[in-house]
């Protein structure tokens, strides 16, 4: 029997306060997160942003106990998935590969090779594909394949996105139903989906399918929820966690909460749709920041649906995904990294603002001038970024 390695890919998170700065640096040093015309600017800019944001982020992590629970939860998901797959007759071993903190992807790959695995199923713990999540993780795995001959020879099957998988949809609907039933008038409870946002340019310019997959997923979950409850609930969708002055996909979570309060909503059932594990966005942003906002807006009951974590229906759904991947047509890593015709991965292609090499040279000079202006404002404490509250 072939030995199967199941590689669970996730974001990662700082486990201690002193990890916050390095964790943020790793995020902003990723060209899938911040795209620059000159690669030489990536690490200096990542250092600046992580330095500026560390204090605020450290406060958020202190509010949830001093660190992220993401690694602990993901490793528990891996253990339970491994156990279930073995019960189903699959000789599987699960591995955790975090993108921006320990255990890094390199560590998981080293363990896979040391264990003599025969083939690998790559399962991103992001139900909805985005350039900045699954895309970045696939690209990192590609990079390791290119530099490691023994790993390159290992057969790999990839699961790209699974927002419409019946097991995932059912698990979400079951957890939502539990909270809806607690409402004073369950049929009137407002089901409010909050997804992590992405810059609007990702969707409109790069062709990122994330927003379409989120919207389609919401529709599927609401249909399943109605099957479970026997009645339909009003629902809405918004996007959270935006940073910086760039426009992100809308509507924004904070604005919709205020609108719902003004409209007289009493019972709000909040669904963290793009998060399969509890972490900073659910425990701090939703549970603390947005709960307070909802109270101020006049919403009486704020019930947050727990993240899937190791919910049995969810783990069964993950096992079904792995089984289907092993039985179905192979989707290799290169195919997984080319989800749509317009999706661009960076630095896979050069980020061109000009029509010729002279234009690109000027682009780089302009970027350097902008970077110098940013440094000057950082040192002086005055400028447009301070005026808009970014610094």
Curated annotation (Swiss-Prot):
Molecular function, one GO term: ferrochelatase activity
Disulfide bonds: none
GO BP: heme biosynthetic process
Entry GO terms, CC: cytoplasm
Subcellular location(s) per record: Cytoplasm
Gene3D superfamilies for the chain: 3.40.50.1400
Protein name: Ferrochelatase
Organism: Prochlorococcus marinus (strain MIT 9303)
Upper lineage: Bacteria, Bacillati, Cyanobacteriota, Cyanophyceae, Synechococcales
Gene this chain is encoded by: hemH
